[in-house]
């Protein structure tokens, strides 16, 4: 009788053990919904002037999550969509939004003056910062981030700019962590930022 019980116990335990092993081997849920690019070293030479006239580097925002988007003020759709999305993200974050810095880097420094950025960027959220620099400095930083941009039109002031439309996200420790595709659901972005703020 005892041996029969042992046999039954082993019979039951075997599939349970197998299920446990399968669960252990199953891939874990990704920490982020956005693309995890931890380890990329973009932005080491980031140094521009914000729309208040203050020189800035990424070190100025240590302890905060920093998002960086490259665009221009006369962009007809992509840029306002990106900034509006981040405005929604900030609302979703509530008090935690104070630990986030949204940065808009112009790829049109010839037209986007400091004054124009000061009028444009805070419309979406007064905490957002527009960044400008000399054309060669913008080109250097864009190249560092693997951001493409090119003028299209008559180039005499009547032109648009084709440009990369994703957003880069740095963690509070200053490391580049995520790439967010254009028009991503703000709730997804907010969840990823909350995870970074929580130490992931």
Regions found by a protein language model. Give the residues of each.
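Structural microenvironment flanking redox-active thiols in thiol-disulfide oxidoreductases
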Residues: 81-141
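C-terminal motif of bacterial Sec signal peptides marking the signal peptidase cleavage site
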Residues: 21-24
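Short active-site neighborhood of thiol/selenol oxidoreductases, capturing the structured segment around
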Residues: 58-82, 86
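Bacterial signal peptide processing site
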Residues: 26-29
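Thiol/disulfide oxidoreductase modules built on the thioredoxin-like
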Residues: 137-192
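N-terminal export leaders
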Residues: 4-13, 17
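Short loop/turn microsegments at loop-to-beta-strand junctions
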Residues: 43-44, 66, 164-166
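A short beta-strand-turn-helix
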Residues: 46-66, 90
């Amino acid at each position: 009788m005892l041996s029969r019980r042992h046999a039954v116990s082993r019979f039951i335990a075997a599939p349970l053990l197998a299920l446990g092993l399968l669960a252990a081997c199953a891939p874990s849920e990704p920490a982020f919904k956005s693309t995890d690019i931890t380890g990329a070293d973009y932005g080491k030479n980031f140094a521009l002037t914000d729309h208040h006239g203050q020189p800035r580097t990424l070190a100025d925002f240590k302890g905060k999550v920093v998002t960086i988007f490259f665009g221009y003020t006369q962009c007809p759709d992509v840029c306002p969509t990106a900034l509006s999305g981040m405005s929604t993200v900030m609302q979703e974050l509530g008090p935690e939004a104070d630990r986030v810095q949204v940065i808009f880097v112009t790829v049109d420094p010839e037209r986007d003056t400091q004054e124009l950025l000061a009028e444009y960027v805070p419309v979406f959220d007064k905490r957002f910062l527009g960044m400008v620099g000399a054309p060669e400095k913008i080109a250097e930083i864009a190249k560092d981030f693997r951001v493409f941009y090119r003028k299209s039109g008559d180039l005499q002031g009547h032109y648009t700019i084709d440009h990369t439309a994703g957003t880069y996200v740095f963690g509070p420790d200053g490391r580049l962590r995520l790439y967010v595709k254009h028009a991503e659901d703000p709730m997804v972005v907010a969840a990823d930022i909350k995870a970074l703020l929580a130490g992931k």
